């Protein structure tokens, strides 16, 4: 076996990718030109990750309640869980590594673990991931070290959770971030300058009615994330264009999900290859070219998410789009 074979090789490759991605991006918000600090965050270009927590999933745990009954039955066979892992994992980097690489929006799906005593909540995508609390602590440690960086946590799917689970999770969120949490405000008021003055760093979006009871939980409809649900990259890009044309009328943040979604037959045809080798690798260059052609602003992109954010220069490409806002300012001041 080569020195980079097996688990150890995979870990080294991931660390190299994370290191390369992190160069210059850990403090990118704090380093933006002064002119952009008064722009609404909804008008800036911000890199995000899809199923942000899925860098680790537990093959030994039961299949999650987000899966169909037939899948749960099949998953009693250990090989099935190994195959599920290949299609459930959409990121290689940990929260810390993603943050250091410039990712500021996190797509989060959570669940209780049926049969487990207590109210612990876990991340989930087919298989259970780490405890949500552990992820929040990892994120908070980064924020303590980078006080001018602002993040978006989008809790958009909940499984096997009643109100008591939600109250438990919401209290965990409050315990983790405390005064860093930004209370709900008009979207256009929320700028970097606003966040810095109030010493806020975290916006929580919570797609469940209990958000109304907590001033620091933003309603899910303030963070729409239209989903193309296609394996065809051309259809995806057309969908992204169409939904961008519609965003200005809503006065919200906006997520462009630059991701391809496997169908059942896609998985059946490419069982052991997994998501990365079947859909992501070959289509990322075209998706990245689409990103490079975008412009942030009221009529343009805001948050763009991707699978396997380290495979191409994704975060840096999205962040660089903000320079176009400066060019726009220059041209308007000269006219």
Regions found by a protein language model. Give the residues of each.
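Eukaryotic endomembrane system proteins
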Residues: 156-158, 164-173, 210
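Acidic, His- and aromatic-enriched active-site or binding-groove loops in soluble protein domains
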Residues: 128-135, 173-188
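Active-site groove signature of glycoside hydrolases
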Residues: 107, 112, 147-161
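Long, acidic (Asp/Glu-rich), low-complexity accessory segments flanking structured domains
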Residues: 1-101, 114-146, 150, 210-220, ...
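A generic structural motif
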Residues: 153, 180-195, 230-237, 257-258, ...
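Conserved, mostly hydrophobic/aromatic
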Residues: 98, 109, 153, 204, ...
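Aromatic-lined glycan-binding groove of carbohydrate-active enzymes
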Residues: 197-278
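Short, well-ordered coil/turn segments that N-cap beta-strands
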Residues: 102-104, 147-151, 198-202, 249-251, ...
């Amino acid at each position: 076996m080569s020195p980079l074979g097996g688990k150890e090789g995979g870990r080294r490759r991931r660390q190299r990718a994370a290191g390369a991605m992190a160069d210059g991006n850990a403090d990118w918000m704090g380093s933006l030109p002064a002119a952009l600090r008064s722009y609404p965050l909804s008008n800036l270009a911000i890199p995000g990750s899809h199923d942000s927590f899925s860098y680790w999933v537990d093959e030994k745990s039961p299949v999650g309640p987000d899966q169909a009954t037939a899948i749960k039955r099949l998953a009693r066979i250990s090989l099935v869980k190994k195959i599920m892992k290949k299609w459930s994992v959409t990121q290689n980097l940990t929260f810390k590594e993603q943050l250091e690489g410039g990712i500021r929006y996190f797509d989060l799906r959570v669940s209780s673990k049926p049969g487990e005593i207590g109210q612990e909540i876990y991340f989930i995508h087919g298989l259970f991931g780490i405890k949500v609390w552990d992820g929040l602590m990892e994120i908070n440690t980064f924020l303590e070290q980078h006080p001018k960086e602002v993040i978006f946590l989008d809790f958009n799917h909940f499984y096997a959770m009643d109100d008591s689970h939600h109250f438990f999770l919401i209290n965990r969120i409050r315990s983790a971030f405390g005064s860093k949490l930004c209370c709900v405000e008009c979207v256009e008021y929320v700028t970097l300058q606003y966040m810095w003055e109030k010493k806020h760093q975290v916006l929580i979006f919570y797609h469940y009615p209990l958000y109304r009871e907590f001033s620091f939980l933003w309603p899910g409809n303030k963070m729409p994330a239209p989903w193309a649900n296609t394996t065809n990259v051309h259809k995806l890009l057309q969908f992204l264009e169409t939904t961008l044309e519609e965003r200005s009328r809503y006065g919200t943040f906006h997520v462009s999900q630059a991701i391809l979604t496997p169908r059942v037959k896609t998985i059946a045809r490419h069982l052991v290859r997994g998501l990365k080798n079947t859909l992501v690798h070959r289509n990322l260059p075209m998706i990245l070219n689409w990103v490079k052609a975008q412009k942030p602003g009221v009529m343009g992109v805001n948050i763009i998410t991707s699978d396997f954010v380290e495979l191409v220069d994704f975060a840096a490409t999205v962040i660089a789009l903000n320079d176009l806002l400066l060019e726009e300012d220059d041209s308007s001041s000269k006219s």
